[in-house]
Regions:
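Bacterial Sec-exported substrate-binding components of ABC uptake systems
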Residues: 2-21, 28-71, 168-199, 309-319
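A short, structured surface patch at a secondary-structure boundary
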Residues: 45, 64-126, 223-226
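Short helix-initiation/N-cap motifs at beta->coil->alpha
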Residues: 49-53, 101-111, 231-242
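Extracytoplasmic substrate-binding proteins
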Residues: 55, 129-206, 227-228, 235-236, ...
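Proline-aspartate-enriched helix->loop->beta-strand connector
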Residues: 62, 109-123, 139, 241-258
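Short secondary-structure boundary segments
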Residues: 69, 125-126, 146, 203, ...
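Alpha-helical, coiled-coil/dimerization segments enriched in small aliphatic residues
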Residues: 91-93, 99, 211-237
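A ligand-binding cleft/hinge motif common to bilobed small-molecule-binding domains
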Residues: 128-136, 252-271
Length: 319
């Protein structure tokens, strides 16, 4: 999980930490890492191989799941496992029926988590000794890290389906997402000219490249991501400089920090030198829901539609 659902500092730390976590898991019985689990795997026990080759065995269908990942929470409810969720973290605000608590996925408290007597814990990253601490208590922990592309997202949904006994429902959710995304992309006309986009994660200029699920959305819509050309130690969530962004002169600026950092067209225009950027001069600085834009679950189609709508408006103005 990267910097989406927290304060600015927490939103920054997660993308960097998540790079150390493997981008996908494999259902042990399926062999290859990219093999998709099947509904048949809903028979328990099931074994899932996670980061570093460690295997997580779930002996019985879980009925007291603790989710420390807002994205995983959305996935669990989407596949029909909501009734099995006993607690979710403080950032899991969707759906509203999720049993939200003070648990933190960024600073996990092993004792507090164990207090919910979970038979499965799902998180986006192993931070603060989470995996070691839960394993010491013989509590199964499944890490589902930030997706690098839509296929990763689909795979994680299927894995959660297998882990919770909702394999068929998960397959149905994924099929629906694939169909929606495919149909939408096919229906959207590509920009007549190469439009440059800058996606802002927070007001210290962390961004995303095409090596992320967010970046893939821009690529599918025919946009050129200015972060792809940045030379940074972080290939997927680089921190850009103000000078780099101004020089790149994006046609569209997407703010995924409207809620966390209170950014909008006015605050962006007030930044030194930013008034010369094409997107700022033309008013093409748009805010998107911080959560929808940063979670790789079933609502990703909403983010895609929002961006496409603004691109079409930009094209009409240029015509």
């Amino acid at each position: 999980m990267h910097k989406h659902q927290h304060t600015a500092s927490a939103k920054l730390a997660a993308p960097i930490r998540v790079m150390a976590v493997a981008s996908c898991f494999a259902i042990a019985s399926c062999g290859a890492a990219q093999s998709a689990p099947t509904p048949a795997a809903a028979h328990f026990p099931v074994s899932i191989t996670g980061p570093g080759g460690a295997t997580v065995t779930i002996a019985q269908k879980p009925h007291r799941i603790v989710s420390l990942s807002p994205t995983a929470t959305e996935m669990l409810f989407a596949i029909g496992a909501g009734a099995q969720v006993a607690a979710v973290d403080d950032q899991s605000n969707y759906p509203s029926s999720a049993p939200r608590t003070k648990l933190s996925g960024f600073q996990p408290n092993i004792e507090a988590i164990a207090g919910y007597s979970p038979d499965l814990v799902v998180a986006a990253e192993d931070t603060g000794g989470l995996v070691h601490g839960l394993q010491a208590l013989n509590l199964p922990i499944l890490i589902e890290p930030a997706a690098k592309n839509l296929d990763d997202s689909y795979l994680e949904i299927k894995q959660l389906g297998v882990a919770t006994g909702h394999g068929a429902e998960a397959e149905s959710v994924v099929a629906g997402m694939r169909s929606q995304v495919g149909a939408f992309v096919a229906s959207v006309s590509r920009p007549a000219r190469q439009l440059r986009v800058y996606h802002e994660l927070d007001n210290t200029y962390y961004s995303v490249t095409s090596a992320t699920f967010i970046g893939q959305v821009y690529k599918l819509l025919g946009l050129s991501n200015i972060a792809d050309s940045a030379t940074a130690a972080t290939p997927d969530y680089p921190q850009l400089s103000a000078e780099y962004i101004v020089a790149a002169n994006p046609d569209l600026i997407v703010l995924a920090d409207t809620r966390c950092c209170q950014q909008d067209l006015g605050t962006v225009a007030a930044r030194p030198g930013w008034g010369a950027i094409t997107a700022v001069k033309s008013g093409q600085v748009i805010g998107v829901d911080d959560d929808v834009a940063s979670r790789w679950g079933p609502r990703i189609i909403e983010f895609m539609r929002a961006i496409a709508a603004h691109v079409q408006q930009l094209e009409k103005k240029a015509a």
